[in-house]
């Protein structure tokens, strides 16, 4: 089965297991042995090039509103799927035009991949499209275990409502004052 993966990321091709920045989206491409293409390259790809496409739509979708993304995606892939981005109703913080565009895009999918059971029920209920879980993948081949111990806490996510950074910080304070917070996402 030939799988194409599509996102706003600027790289093309397969992802090797020794990739230096094996984020979840990159790990999915690697684990599925998929070829990745950025959105602007869709128009250059052959008809029915892939049996299945997996797409991650960006949080900021305004630039896509006037691009024939759905038409190009369906031309290139025999089956089209989308992976939800962020928490289940994040998209409802967008402009009305973006919300309608996003919802209409979802309803044209053969399958919607979700993060968890709650999101699965939500997306199936609101779109009546088949939903399945696509769990987080960690490829740990290049992770070197620490040989020293430490007492600090690392918290992830940004300090915005969407990621609960402040909540994580409060929990970490219960454990230690030595806290490291990395910036990710938006």
Please give the residue ranges for each predicted region.
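Short loop/helix-cap segments at secondary-structure boundaries that form the rim of catalytic
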Residues: 45-48, 121-126, 143-148, 186
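Short, charged N-terminal beta->alpha structural module
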Residues: 1-37, 166-173
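A short, charged/proline- and glycine-enriched loop
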Residues: 1-3, 8-9, 50, 144-153
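Donor nucleotide-sugar binding/catalytic pocket of nucleotide-sugar-dependent glycosyltransferases
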Residues: 110-122, 128-143
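Conserved catalytic-core segment of nucleotide-activated headgroup transferases in glycan assembly
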Residues: 16-17, 21, 139-186
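Extended catalytic core of nucleotide-activated donor transferases of GT-like folds
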Residues: 4, 8, 31-124
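Short beta-strand/turn micro-motifs composed of small residues
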Residues: 7, 84, 114-116, 135, ...
């Amino acid at each position: 089965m030939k799988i194409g993966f599509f996102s706003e990321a600027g790289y093309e091709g397969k992802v090797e297991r020794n990739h230096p920045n094996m984020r979840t989206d990159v790990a999915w491409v690697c684990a599925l042995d998929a070829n990745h293409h950025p959105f602007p390259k869709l128009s250059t790809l052959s008809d029915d090039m892939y049996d299945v496409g997996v797409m991650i739509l960006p949080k900021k979708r305004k630039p896509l509103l006037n691009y024939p993304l759905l038409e190009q995606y369906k031309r290139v892939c025999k089956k089209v799927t989308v992976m939800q981005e962020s928490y289940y109703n994040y998209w409802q913080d967008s402009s009305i035009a973006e919300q309608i565009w996003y919802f209409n895009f979802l309803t044209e999918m053969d399958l919607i991949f979700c993060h968890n059971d709650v999101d699965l029920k939500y997306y199936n209920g609101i779109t009546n499209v088949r939903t399945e879980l696509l769990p987080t993948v960690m490829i740990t081949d290049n992770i070197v275990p620490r040989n020293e111990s430490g007492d600090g806490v690392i918290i992830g996510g940004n300090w915005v409502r969407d990621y609960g950074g402040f909540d994580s910080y409060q929990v970490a304070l219960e454990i230690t004052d030595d806290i490291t917070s990395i910036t990710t996402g938006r």
